[in-house]
């Protein structure tokens, strides 16, 4: 089977180019129409840990009921999905660019599932997963404000290239495996991994790959099974078609993607969806000599392990990440120079007040790829187990590599303080927030991003009520939160008016501990 013929088959299967493929296109889900009066309620409760107030990551993503147009300029359309469109959005104050996903409520088959997608996205923080920043909702529409990826779909790269070199394919697959590892560690199964659901962050040749759609994702614990037939014919696992499967369906899908990257066509193909599904159900595939003769035995071995029919015998995601093909082919990408200021920034972060820590976290989440490129590479290099999070030991080992033989005795407390949700692991954005240099964040246009987040009513000042909403809930009394806010105002509210204006906010951000 030749590449040119196979690529043409893929082209015919590509129905529409869209930035986000909305769930429901290829599923047999039992759905029902929901009423339009469902209102999404964000839970902004805080966590108390060791006498401090900390925020769950999902609480940095607020749901607004105001007019989207008051904050964003709606620019060009980026794509069309089944139930809505995706536009480029421009923040009127900061000029930051975003992708705005618009969903019309009366066209959603199951609005509760859509809110489940939002809840899942709010938990996620990984270099290879698109970021969700905030949501808007009115009577007719729901809007997701997301990270803008200016690169192309992985699908389009396959169409253009026909196939990838093993080195390039391994670089892509390592990112996909890492994202799957992270999702599964959170007990989330994706269920629709396919090249159309991956975007390159930019047009740069070394750009990160991002999963951009979570419409079919669901929470699924270890040892649990689900029965809904969901996915896309080429990439769906046989067990999904049988109606009983677990998280290993994602590993099968990754095997289909890897096969396609290396030869330009999927292992199970046909002129109709039914033909494809029949072949998937059998699970039999071949490495055709014309296309696979020059491909290494290691690559074919990994594909065979990923596409093992019996899920109990299929390789785990950890085994995929540690497979010789991945470790050998991506070795050159792992040498990153660690800055000697890394430990200094980590220690300084511990001393900051809670408002500044949250502000730095918001900044870290919003900064573009160019601004965090070095820190991102450091994070990936330190993440030895490719889990998408950092353990204390991984950071300590990294510090020793750059010559820190005498690690400060309080280092474990420093690292615990960075762990914003007490998970025992340091997440991507937490690491960026704790290590970002002042010269990067101490700019008016950058500091406006967190200030506007705190200034919910947009009057140019951060009030006590707004701080309560950020740190906890403004409708529930909490002495711990009240005490934290009083202490914060004493430090930051220099003119004593009970509010924090932007000048006071900038002074707080520039203050050296």
From Swiss-Prot:
InterPro entries: CDPK_Ser/Thr_kinases (IPR050205), EF-hand-dom_pair (IPR011992), EF_Hand_1_Ca_BS (IPR018247), EF_hand_dom (IPR002048), Kinase-like_dom_sf (IPR011009), Prot_kinase_dom (IPR000719), Protein_kinase_ATP_BS (IPR017441), Ser/Thr_kinase_AS (IPR008271). A motif (J domain autoinhibitory motif) lies at residues 345-353. It catalyses: L-seryl-[protein] + ATP = O-phospho-L-seryl-[protein] + ADP + H(+); L-threonyl-[protein] + ATP = O-phospho-L-threonyl-[protein] + ADP + H(+). The keyword Transferase applies. Its cofactor is Mg(2+). Ca(2+) 2 binds at residues 455, 457, 459, 461, 466. Its EC number is 2.7.11.1. The active site is at 192 (proton acceptor). Pfam families: EF-hand_7 (PF13499), Pkinase (PF00069). Residues 72-326 form the Protein kinase domain. Calcium-dependent protein kinase which acts as a sensor and effector of intracellular Ca(2+) levels probably in part downstream of cGMP-activated PKG kinase. During male gametogenesis in the mosquito gut, required for male exflagellation, possibly by regulating male gamete exit from the host erythrocytes. Not required for asexual blood stage proliferation. This is Calcium-dependent protein kinase 2. It comes from Plasmodium falciparum (isolate K1 / Thailand). The lineage of its organism: Eukaryota, Sar, Alveolata, Apicomplexa, Aconoidasida.
